[in-house]
């Protein structure tokens, strides 16, 4: 006879479901608790965090919610991930969400940027994806990494490819120029799919 062990979230103690739960270094959290976390935290990063780290992160998220409510941007670059810049306060937001407050999108300080990379990840059949990677220091979030192209892998020889690369460059150049940053910026690094 099979036995089923019922597990509870180590944070809110509700019953875990098979989908959306996240594994931590010293526990597991439910989908509802995971949805409160920053969208920029990857599963790999979560596995290195403790329950105490998550509790601290949730305190940051509460403060961020108040911050995003008062966030005033003066520049916008629209795209799959849109960029919102507050030049006066040297802050920015990158988000897929239409409603930044409802999403509790992370407000990032420009001086926390350590390096930026535009990366082409090759796939099969002469196709690729274009990513922007922004590494941060002295920030609750350590990196922002996102795919620029709207659809799955794009053909190297298509207009969509050129438009996507130009969109990535525009987004990154806008960040660097708006804040007059002197950061390590790699415009083009080509990796194979296996290196990603």
For the regions a protein language model found, what residue spans apply to each?
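Short, exposed beta-strand/loop patches in secreted or surface proteins that constitute
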Residues: 21, 81-85, 106
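Secondary-structure transition/turn motif
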Residues: 32-35, 94-100, 135-138
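N-terminal cysteine/histidine-rich coordination modules
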Residues: 1-60
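Acidic, Ser/Thr- and proline-rich intrinsically disordered linker/docking segments
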Residues: 116-196
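Intrinsically disordered, low-complexity boundary segments flanking structured domains
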Residues: 2, 80, 103-105
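Phosphoinositide-binding peripheral membrane targeting modules
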Residues: 88-131
């Amino acid at each position: 006879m099979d036995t089923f062990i019922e597990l509870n979230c180590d944070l809110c103690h509700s019953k875990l479901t098979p989908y959306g739960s996240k594994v931590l270094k010293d526990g597991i959290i439910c989908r509802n608790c995971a949805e409160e976390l920053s969208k920029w935290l990857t599963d790999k990063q979560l596995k290195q965090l403790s329950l105490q780290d998550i509790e601290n992160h949730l305190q940051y998220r509460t403060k961020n919610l108040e911050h995003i409510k008062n966030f005033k941007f003066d520049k916008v670059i629209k795209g799959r991930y849109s960029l919102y810049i507050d030049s006066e306060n040297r802050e920015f937001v990158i988000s897929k969400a239409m409603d930044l407050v409802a999403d509790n999108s992370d407000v990032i300080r420009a001086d926390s940027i350590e390096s930026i990379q535009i990366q082409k990840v090759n796939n099969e059949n002469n196709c690729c994806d274009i990513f922007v990677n922004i590494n941060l220091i002295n920030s609750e979030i350590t990196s922002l990494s996102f795919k620029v192209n709207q659809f799955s892998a794009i053909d190297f020889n298509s207009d969509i490819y050129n438009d996507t690369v130009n969109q990535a460059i525009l987004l990154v150049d806008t960040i660097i120029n708006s804040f007059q940053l002197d950061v390590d910026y790699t415009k083009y690094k080509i990796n194979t799919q296996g290196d990603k």
